[in-house]
Amino acid sequence: AWGFILSAGQALGQAEGYKSLPLNAEFVSPPDSGEPKDRRAESARRQRYSERLRLVNDIYKGSASFEDNQAAFDQWYNEVVFAQMSQDSDAMLEAMATNREAMFKQLGNASNAQAVNHLVANLAFNKFQEIVTDNYPPASRLNAVVILGRLDQTIAKPRNVAPAPLAKALPVLLQYVQDGALPEYVRVGALWGIERHCRIDGQKQNTQIAAQQRSQVIAALLPLLGPKPDDRTQPVDYWMNRMATRSLGA
């Protein structure tokens, strides 16, 4: 489904010369220039990468202090993880889904709530909004809006803790759906996130989505159940209609 939607979005005629977040060359090799690489430098780079990843995992486990290492933690995500997801090289595009799922796996295994909350509510929430709304590669923008829809303020734990989606992400996703200037693949990705918010909320005994916000969801999604606009492709219209229907029925 995402392939159809992304292809339709790229056909909208976005300009070339996409933005990308700067990669930290201390941890990640710069884009391939075609010149032979220095093996010793590459080995040192891989060593630094492994050491920083180990530190981040130790922070999540609580065996390293988040307060003492926040600068290193922030640098890892802003200059490595998020930056990798903003590149348009073939290698980075192929690794994008793997990198995304690795990030969510880290969150699922983490026990340090302070570090998790900082990543979700501050770093990821802010940086992926930037990627969604600016001239980043289409795959990066779609990936970013999907991540925004998956951010949780309470991380699910098997058999005993249900997920609670990040509440402040829902108004942002609604704004994307209603913004006709955004590529339609972004709007479909936002609808997927809205459906997730509504579905999880519908499974709870006590709803977390306020009545006023539910009214905003209805107002944003009902128009999508109407006839297909002339400038919208059939696959995109199908997924918009489907996600809107599932959200309203949750």
Q: What are the roles of these predicted feature ranges?
A:
Residues G249-A250:
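Long alpha-helical repeat scaffolds
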